[in-house]
Amino acid sequence: MAQNSLQIHCKDGSVYVIPTENVDSITFGDADSLNVVEVELAGSWLWGSAEKGYYELLSFSKDHTYTAYDNYFTYGFDTTTYGFYSQYSAMLTLWSNGFGYQHRYNWYITGLSANALSVMTKMGPFTYYRLQPEILNIRVGDSIKCTDGDSIVFADGVVVRIEDGKLYGIKEGSTFIQKYIASTGLIYAYKVVVE
């Protein structure tokens, strides 16, 4: 017989029955330490790989629409797709216009935190990092040096590049980077404008 419910017996005699399909996790602790903050998918998330030659910026809205901007910087072109999404527990389904015809992608969310969205797709695992509202500005030929143990972990190498722990502006335009913040041990994404 399948076990499909969780039954909780309270000291006051009340009993609660919760279907296990509604349970995502159970955490034990004292009441003061159990301030759980639900992380939302809404916002923008960046995945990038200099080795693979492109980055993708996913932007999820609270109305369940999304856009995906892919910049294939190695090949010199970019694409934007849009559509809507649904999330049921750890399953994320994206429907898009996909170059003029319908696409549906089923992704399994393996991790969702304040700064990172990790998914398993048909193409393998990917981790996207939350885009911060701060925009970094740099001039062509100038650099930004990371301080306090921070480091740039992704740059496209076309608009900006990483060299000797610094971010250099190569040509005018805008792009995105991923930056490791040593004080938190987390990676975040930032937009960079080069003038």
Regions found by a protein language model. Name each.
Residues 9-33:
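N-terminal targeting signals for Sec/Tat export/insertion, comprising classic cleavable signal peptides
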Residues 50-102:
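N-terminal glycine/threonine-rich, aromatic-flanked beta-hairpin/loop signature
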Residues 25, 33, 64, 79, ...:
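Coil residues (strongly favoring Ser/Thr
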Residues 1-7:
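Bacterial Sec-dependent N-terminal signal peptides
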Residues 32-35, 78-87, 118-134:
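Edge beta-strand at a domain terminus
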Residues 91-133:
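Beta-sheet ligand-binding and adhesion/scaffold domains
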Residues 80, 86, 105-116, 131-195:
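Extracytoplasmic soluble-region selector
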Residues 31-46, 139, 145-147:
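N-terminal helix-cap/turn-to-beta initiation motif at the start of protein domains
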